[in-house]
A protein has these predicted regions:
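Short, intrinsically disordered, charge-biased short linear motifs at domain edges
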Residues: 16-24, 56-63
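A boundary/linker detector
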Residues: 1-20, 38-40, 92-113
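Histidine-centered nuclease catalytic patch
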Residues: 40-71, 84
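Basic side chains
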Residues: 5, 28, 80-83, 103
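Short cysteine-rich loop/turn motifs with clustered Cys
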Residues: 17-50, 73
Length: 113
């Protein structure tokens, strides 16, 4: 991996926020994923996958304000994607439903080996 790509990988939890702002979000949310509850304080691996999620996606005009940002683990952030939801609760329900669907796929694939 080139040095420039490597530096982007370790650039921080969001390309749109400073590390300081991301840390404010993490502290406010107690280092827990809003969607699944993964605790980033539990171990290094959990902490490593924490990101900052734009509730109303940045790509769709969402602001970088504190009330539009939540702590999310990478899997939940990817599942939520750039969709727009009626509420944060609707987004959470969508993410948790998809995670459960994927859990069943995982279990079937592992069982088949």
């Amino acid at each position: 991996m080139s040095l420039s790509r490597l530096s982007k990988f370790f650039a921080g939890p969001s390309p749109h926020l400073s590390r300081e702002d991301a840390l404010k979000i993490f502290k406010r949310d107690r280092f827990k994923c809003y969607y699944c509850g993964l605790d980033g304080r539990h171990n290094y691996e959990n902490w490593l996958i924490l990101t900052v999620d734009h509730v109303h996606p940045h790509a769709k005009g969402g602001q970088r304000s504190m009330n539009n940002l939540v702590t999310a683990c990478q899997p939940c952030n990817l599942i939520k994607g750039k969709r727009i939801y009626k509420s944060l609760q609707e987004a959470k329900e969508y993410v948790l439903t998809k995670r459960e669907e994927w859990r069943h796929v995982f279990q079937e694939q592992v069982k088949a080996v």
